[in-house]
Amino acid sequence: MDRSIMPIDSPARDKPPDELVWPLRLFLILLGYSTVATPAAILIYYVRRNRHAFETPYLSIRLLLRSFAVGNPEYQLIPTGEKQARKENDSIPQTRAQCINVIILLLFFFSGIQVTLVAMGVLQERIITRGYRRSDQLEVEDKFGETQFLIFCNRIVALVLSLMILAKDWTKQPPHVPPLYVHSYTSFSNTISSWCQYEALKYVSFPTQTICKASKVVVTMLMGRLVRGQRYSWFEYGCGCTIAFGASLFLLSSSSKGAGSTITYTSFSGMILMAGYLLFDAFTLNWQKALFDTKPKVSKYQMMFGVNFFSAILCAVSLIEQGTLWSSIKFGAEHVDFSRDVFLLSLSGAIGQIFIYSTIERFGPIVFAVIMTIRQMLSIVLSTIMYGHELTFLAAIGFMIVFAAIFVDIHKKYSDKSRGPQRSW
């Protein structure tokens, strides 16, 4: 039986996983990635050593290799104009009208992220948990079990969508100053972060998962100091810790806290994996913001294309080495409605990326981390309302703590705006 196909009645394995398995799996993944990274590193070294031989005004393979390994540093001297300078300084609105516009924009991004992620969750659950009928035997159903193929399809659709947008507005795009390979860092960290997150679910209890995910804001701030040299005041760190505490209190006290979690222990492996998830996720957000801050900045569609290009390569290499790429394609060809669901899942993910990159570009990684925390809380609130569950007193206190911390931070930024430009989360 193909590895991408699971019997419809396959039982779940409840016994604790072997803690020696995940390091081996991670090693094999990194070994597979090295088959791409090593030749790429050699190519980058060669082009950088002979960069003058690759300088040409014409579109050719030499120009593409130069853009990949060296970038276009000569465009860094181009004046970016008052419009961009003004945009970098308007993160804190100075008037009530600007404040309303920023709030509307933030709510629009939040709604877009919420809708696309909910759609992805529904479609992914449909694909993974339910069987698909064979086109030649309608009474036979098979489950699809290769989640990495779904990620690969998501990257391909996002790659095509970003390429179409770039082709349409090519003349409006800023010069891409950094070398193209810098997007591979985002792809790698995002891939490893997702892997650590899913792998950690086998080793950590629900309370540990909750506290770690709620701490994402603080970890993102610390990583911002390391990656971008962004300085935060003790007051801002205090607000971040307060948000983490309030979110943890809410999520741990909500009536749905036991849903989807059967692990009652937390092992050392689980803590390592959760730490890996938080660190790589925080690096991803801050590295993207660092690229957005280049002058002229990288556009969100350039970012989207570069990240998905390298992510698609990494996923393809992994699928080929595991022997599941062709079996997954064969599954789609042989089963009714599977290709449709995968396309809708991938399209939802691609549109969601546009909202995510727009949020990071406009408001920064900290705001995005806060949005994801609030999104998780609102999902529980909506579930509580829809199914008639009761929201506990401690959960309500945690909910109020989170929004009080956000309000206090915003109020302080407005109070201090007369002292000069302030940092924005």
Curated annotation (Swiss-Prot):
The organism encoding this protein is Caenorhabditis elegans
According to the UniProt entry, its GO molecular function terms are:
3'-phosphoadenosine 5'-phosphosulfate transmembrane transporter activity
Question: Mind telling me what this protein is named?
Answer: Adenosine 3'-phospho 5'-phosphosulfate transporter 1
Could you list the residue ranges that cross the membrane?
Answer: 27-47, 102-122, 147-167, 232-252, 263-283, 303-323, 342-360, 365-387, 391-411
Recorded hits in InterPro entries, A to Z, give:
SCL35B1-4/HUT1 (IPR013657)
Biological process terms in GO annotation? 3'-phosphoadenosine 5'-phosphosulfate transport; transmembrane transport
Q: Which of UniProt's keywords are assigned here?
A: Golgi apparatus, Membrane, Transmembrane, Transmembrane helix, Transport
> What does the record say about its membrane topology?
Multi-pass membrane protein
Annotated compartments: Golgi apparatus membrane
Q: What is its main location?
A: Golgi
Q: Spell out the family assignment given in the record's similarity comment.
A: Belongs to the nucleotide-sugar transporter family. SLC35B subfamily.
Q: Which GO terms describe its cellular component?
A: endoplasmic reticulum membrane; Golgi apparatus; Golgi cisterna membrane; Golgi membrane
Q: What does this protein do?
A: Mediates the transport of adenosine 3'-phospho 5'-phosphosulfate (PAPS), from cytosol into Golgi. PAPS is a universal sulfuryl donor for sulfation events that take place in the Golgi.
